[in-house]
């Protein structure tokens, strides 16, 4: 059977421009998901195209993804990224992956030994918040997690990502091999420290001596990742097949924009990612906060309220004047003043985000973005709210976003249709929803300490603002609530250069007030 590895592809398809036979597994990556395929692997492919080298990627999946891995092997570890822009699509065949391992197809033993090979310099991860096995209330290793319990009892046969990495580092140390860099590429705040806490927490439970060695020898760079990559669908895979003239079950579609900011702290070398446009910096935090609050915060706002209002895709929300204006104002009047970043035009950044959101080719579903909200709400909205509370400044759209999440997880949209809520806390949330009336819903959901810390729950201003926003959605529906909030909140009736000037002045004053 022909695959993209053996078929003759159209001339407009970008193919690998390097000798794939030279590749070795210098990067071992947990999580062959959509985002990794269209982001880290693609940027590594770019480096190989221009610089050559042997920085191959071995893809790892543990207890799922065996079918995808089988399909990847059948096409010589090649797959397609279809960049979809307003001016057309660009298919790119990625060749940076040189092998893959799966616990079902291969074995856990084979996976662990792969990490112990001498050439491995980087272990990277896209495993979502859940994969790090961190207790969100403490930021420490969750020792009640079933996989962590198993790994502590059977450390040489681990089932979790932290357990596997610690066991691999233990074996490398015993064999006199150098350590590797652990690189989180997940879209979570302070991801370098998150994975470091997970690894050191696991190592400390096993052996304080091992934990000390890891602390001294292993680096955990922070990263900021940005690219809109919707989950693959039958429709997107068919579009890729049309572009190639042959099916690619591992293919993925995404927007043209891509950004990766990395703390330049690697103990065993790295690809020359900067030649592919990656920003290597000393401190990732300002970039991370900008992206989490302005992009992800407005994305979540549109996802919850847009879904409730009947919008299937983010681009549909952008066709609505009220939702578009709300997203812009949320970014510039509520989120931007909470940031500490220099040499970045935040108004230009916000305008570029609106253009990206409006891309109709992506078909990024509001339902997909609304998933796992309990894990996302704190960094995307609640941190900004804390800053506003401390400054006594206004945050009506952030309040509406939080209330929108509460309405969404209550399980019924504005048309009365049931919502398929996907969240790690779904059972807890469902129990609270079922035991509370609509008038009690806010106080019930605020009891979720995994999301809402005491400093917020005990703040009357916070509770009152969320209650009012909830009542607006419950009474008027999400769309009308957005319009009402825009009408009632302070706004700037300007456009173009004048709006940019006024917003810049407001940002300057907010920073000045904070410094005072």
For the regions a language model picked out, list residue spans one by one.
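Substrate/ligand-engaging "lid" and interaction regions
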Residues: 1-494, 512
């Amino acid at each position: 059977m022909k695959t993209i590895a053996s078929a003759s592809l159209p001339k407009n398809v970008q193919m690998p421009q390097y000798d794939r036979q030279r590749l070795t597994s210098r990067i071992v990556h947990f999580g062959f998901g959509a985002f990794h395929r269209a982001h880290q692997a693609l940027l590594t492919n770019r480096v190989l195209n221009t610089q050559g080298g042997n920085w191959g990627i071995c893809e790892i999946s543990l207890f799922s993804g065996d079918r995808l891995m089988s399909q990847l092997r059948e096409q010589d570890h090649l797959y397609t990224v279809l960049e979809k822009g307003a001016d057309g699509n660009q298919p790119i065949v990625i060749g940076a992956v040189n092998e893959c391992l799966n616990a079902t197809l291969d074995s856990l033993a084979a996976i662990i030994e792969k990490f112990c090979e001498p050439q491995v310099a980087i272990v990277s991860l896209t495993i979502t918040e859940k994969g790090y096995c961190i207790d969100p209330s403490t930021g420490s290793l969750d020792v009640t997690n079933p996989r962590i319990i198993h790994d502590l009892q059977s450390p040489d046969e681990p089932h979790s990502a932290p357990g596997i990495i610690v066991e691999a580092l233990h074996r490398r140390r015993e064999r006199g091999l150098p350590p590797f860099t652990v690189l989180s590429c997940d879209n979570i705040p302070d991801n370098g420290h998150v994975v470091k806490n997970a690894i050191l927490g696991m190592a400390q439970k096993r052996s304080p001596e091992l934990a000390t060695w890891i602390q001294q020898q292993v680096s955990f760079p922070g990263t900021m990742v940005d690219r809109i990559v919707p989950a693959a669908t039958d429709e997107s895979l068919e579009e890729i097949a049309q572009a190639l003239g042959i099916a690619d079950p591992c293919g993925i579609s995404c927007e043209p924009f891509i950004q990766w900011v990395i703390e330049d702290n690697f103990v065993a070398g790295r690809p020359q990612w900067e030649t592919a446009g990656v920003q290597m910096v000393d401190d990732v935090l300002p970039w991370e906060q900008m992206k989490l609050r302005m992009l992800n915060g407005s994305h979540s706002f549109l996802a919850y309220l847009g879904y409730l209002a009947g919008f299937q895709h983010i681009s549909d929300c952008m066709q609505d004047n009220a939702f578009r204006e709300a997203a812009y104002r949320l970014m510039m009047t509520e989120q931007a003043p909470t940031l500490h970043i220099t040499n970045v035009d935040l108004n230009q950044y916000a305008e570029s985000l609106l253009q990206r959101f409006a891309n109709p080719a992506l078909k990024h579903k509001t339902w997909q973005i609304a998933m796992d909200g309990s894990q996302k709400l704190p960094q995307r909205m609640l941190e900004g709210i804390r800053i506003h509370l401390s400054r006594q400044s206004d945050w009506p759209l952030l309040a509406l976003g939080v209330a929108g999440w509460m309405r969404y997880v209550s399980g019924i949209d504005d048309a009365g249709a049931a919502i398929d809520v996907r969240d790690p806390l779904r059972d807890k949330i469902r129990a609270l929803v079922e035991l509370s009336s609509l008038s009690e819903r806010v106080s019930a959901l605020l009891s979720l300490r995994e999301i809402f810390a005491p400093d917020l729950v005990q703040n009357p201003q916070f509770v009152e603002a969320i209650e009012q926003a909830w009542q607006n959605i419950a009474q008027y529906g999400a769309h009308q609530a957005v319009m009402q909030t825009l009408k009632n909140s302070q706004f700037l009736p300007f456009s173009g250069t004048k709006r940019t000037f006024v917003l810049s002045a407001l940002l300057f004053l907010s920073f000045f007030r904070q410094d005072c």
